[in-house]
Amino acid sequence: MNALLDEASSKLYLNSDVTAELRLEGSPHELIVNVFNGHHTALDTSLVEFLINSLDGSTSETISVYTTERVTGNMQVVDWNLYKSKWTQLQLIDFPEPGPRPIADLPIGADRSALLFSLRDVRGKLGEPVARQTPLGWTCLGSPEMDPGVLQTNFTFLVNNLST
């Protein structure tokens, strides 16, 4: 499973196919999703709980997540080990290897800030990627492309919790 550290996200979600693969079971739940023009739509989901660990075992936390179909769409995971040789500040960073699935399955957001905060940042020149060590391990901010003109867009969906 690949996690996406997303400070703009306010709830934890996990792709439902991963939930099924891991045989995680939870309680049914209904979420109200804010969509365009002030409209809302109901989303049937489950609330599941599991233990998340850093790869080195130094951090461990039980988290509750809502299941959904492709929460990040088809957002591909960047294997920074393939790109780090382009920038001197990244060359000695031991980035984690992505999981076997090429997409991000679990956005971890502001509701779990203890997993997101920066223990150490390694920066280069203005516009270059920044390596960030978090309690879960190393990640990188920025584009893996040398051209800073390459545009990247990420979408965040806002969800309200509706108690059932």
Question: What are the roles of these predicted feature ranges?
Answer:
Residues 7, 39-45, 49-164:
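Intrinsically disordered, low-complexity regulatory segments at domain boundaries
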